[in-house]
């Protein structure tokens, strides 16, 4: 189950766009071998809102593109398919039978700015940021160079296999 809540009014969001975001989330999860019913919440916000969240949770007082709030715990270097592939989840991890993976806060305003900066479509940028965030929910990180290389490779592989190119 994917919940989308549009809390901004700077970028037009229609059902087709929301469905594409749901499709890329589902696709990325399948690519990462998530073989259980799941729940992810996505909020679309603007730069001011994501700046506030970034300051509150990361103590960084500036707008960013996307923030991820994973609900599962991972040791450094471990990802979902390494730890939870055949795991028996406790009821506390589930909501009405769905594994709660976490929340995504995506600034559509920042995504639009970046799509222009990088010279590709808004859809490609939002799909990339969504994949990036989903991978964070699954334990990927980019704080260390080796982790960053692995995460970037997975992002590009998923984008290409989903037929979204730069």
From Swiss-Prot:
Gene Ontology biological-process entries: rRNA processing
Annotated compartments: Cytoplasm
Details of cofactor binding: Binds 1 zinc ion.
Matching SUPFAM superfamilies: Metalloproteases ('zincins'), catalytic domain (SSF55486)
Keyword Hydrolase tagged: yes
Keyword annotations from UniProtKB, A to Z: Cytoplasm, Endonuclease, Hydrolase, Metal-binding, Nuclease, Ribosome biogenesis, rRNA processing, Zinc
Binding positions (Zn(2+)): 132, 136, 142
Protein name in UniProt: Endoribonuclease YbeY
């Amino acid at each position: 189950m994917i919940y989308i809540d549009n809390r901004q009014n700077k970028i037009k969001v229609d059902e087709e766009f929301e469905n594409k975001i749901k499709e890329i989330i589902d696709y990325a999860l399948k690519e990462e071998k998530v073989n259980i019913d799941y729940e992810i919440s996505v909020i679309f916000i603007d730069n001011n809102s994501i700046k506030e969240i970034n300051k509150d949770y990361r103590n960084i007082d500036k707008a960013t593109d996307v923030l991820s709030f994973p609900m599962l715990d991972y040791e450094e270097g471990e990802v979902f398919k390494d730890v939870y592939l055949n795991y028996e989840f406790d009821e506390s991890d589930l909501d009405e039978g769905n594994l709660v993976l976490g929340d995504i806060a995506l600034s559509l305003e920042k995504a639009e700015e970046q799509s222009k900066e990088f010279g590709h479509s808004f859809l490609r940028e939002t799909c990339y940021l969504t994949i990036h965030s989903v991978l964070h929910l699954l334990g990927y990180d980019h704080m260390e160079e080796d982790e960053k290389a692995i995460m970037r490779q997975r992002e590009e592989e998923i984008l290409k296999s989903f037929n979204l190119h730069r």
